[in-house]
């Protein structure tokens, strides 16, 4: 289920925002009435979309938007009066916060939510790819350490050590990293 956080001091605004994001699959959004409460909720749970309806009772909300972008993967939307939105838009857009001037139409709001959700999905893909590449780097380092071990302790050339690891991996149906780990563990 999609998770959204609505940060707003007004109940009428909460109902309006919740009704419109429900159309996009965010049927049970979490609510926070202040910046402090929102930060606690963001620390406790991951959200796809965070909507900040300014001003908040304890702060305006633009700092919260910047914090949310830096500390979470959520797409962040800041709702502000048009005059204020124009003033803070450039600074917040540099951080990746979507700024929507009030009043806005339901279609504009839904489009902003869809863009924020797209940002979240894109970041999730980038994080997954990053984790995959990090794992690959760990495996390569492990294989290189095993090769160095074979070269130093068994007098093999680099090509022979590489071939031994590759052949053992194919014969045992293990990854090269697992074979390298076995070689290093066996000789410790």
Q: Where do the protein language model's features map onto the residues?
A:
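Alpha4 helix (beta4-alpha4-beta5 surface) of REC/receiver domains from two-component response regulators
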Residues: 63, 82-98
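C-terminal output/effector regions of signal-responsive regulators
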Residues: 131-188
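The C-terminal output helix
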Residues: 115-128
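Conserved phosphotransfer microenvironments
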Residues: 14, 35-39, 48-72, 83
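C-terminal output helix
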Residues: 104-113
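Short hydrophobic/Thr-rich beta-strand motif most characteristic of the beta2 strand and flanking loop
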Residues: 26-34
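Conserved acidic segment of CheY-like receiver
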Residues: 1-12, 17-21, 50
């Amino acid at each position: 289920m999609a998770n959204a956080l609505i940060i707003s001091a007004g109940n009428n605004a909460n109902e309006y925002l919740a009704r419109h994001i429900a159309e996009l699959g965010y049927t049970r959004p979490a609510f926070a009435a202040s910046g402090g409460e929102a930060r606690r909720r963001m620390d406790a749970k991951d959200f796809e979309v965070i909507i900040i309806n300014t001003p908040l009772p304890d702060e305006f909300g633009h700092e919260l938007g910047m914090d949310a972008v830096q500390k979470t993967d959520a797409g962040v939307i800041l709702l502000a009066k048009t005059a204020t939105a124009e003033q803070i838009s450039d600074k917040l857009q540099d951080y990746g916060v979507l700024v929507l001037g009030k009043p806005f139409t339901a279609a504009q709001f839904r489009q902003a939510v869809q863009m924020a959700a797209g940002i979240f999905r894109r970041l999730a893909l980038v994080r997954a790819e990053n984790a995959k590449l990090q794992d690959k780097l760990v495996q390569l380092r492990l294989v290189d350490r095993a090769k160095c071990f074979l070269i130093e302790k068994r007098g093999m050339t680099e090509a022979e050590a590489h071939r031994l690891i590759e052949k053992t991996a194919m014969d045992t149906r293990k990854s090269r990293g697992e074979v390298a780990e076995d070689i290093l563990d066996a000789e410790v």
